[in-house]
Amino acid sequence: DVPAACKKDIIYKLLSINDKFAKTKIYNDFKKNSVIKPFINNLRKGHVLVNGNYSTLCGNPVEMLLHSIGKFTGESIVGIGNVHSLRFKDNVEILGSRSPHVCQGNILIAKNKRNKLVDKYLNISEEIVVVNSIGENLLQRLSGSDFDSDTVMLTDNNILLKAAKKNYKKFLVPTCNVTAKKIKRKYTNEDKCDLDIKTSKNLIGQIVNLSQELNSLLWDLINNNRKDLDLMELYYDICQLDVMSGIRSEERRVG
């Protein structure tokens, strides 16, 4: 037998010996103070455990392999509206969300579809999700994500899926059409210093914090049955902040 390392090990070991131990004061005090109270405290902080994980995004890898040998037809292998994840069962509907979650258009509902070509040519784990960017606005939907190790929270929790489906078609995805201006730089201390100064003035924190305040105001207006015009104007502002957060995130790379 493995020796008990802490109080909870002793409690569980006593339970395994005699289930009547669950009727004792020692067990009830343990359950109240060590199980229920911490759970409630975590709920108050917004920490709720759900089935799922944070998966690293991998975009259209098989299509890139086909393109490298001149056999890419332009069609998606995984398919529009689908993802390939080993973390969930095949044909299960899953919800995806990334941080920062700026607006209601930043959630993804997708079908988990296992693909034979992905399994054949890629050695992926449960922490990697293969996604599709061909013919769908996935990267903008997931808060301006890209494929340089960005992650997405995936879950098959029915409560969250039901909530996501309520207004999924009503909120369009905020999309950035701003073209980045390329700046030629040299690998010198002067250019590195100039880049550090410019990126140090990044307003990403203020942008996301303001979006949170406006979202709180939006839902307060909804709960108090305010006019649709008020809601749409406010939502447009939130959408602009979503686009701005993506621009601010990317400017560090383009200089």
Residue ranges, per PLM feature:
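Core catalytic machinery and nucleic-acid-binding channels of phosphodiester-processing enzymes
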Residues: D1-G255
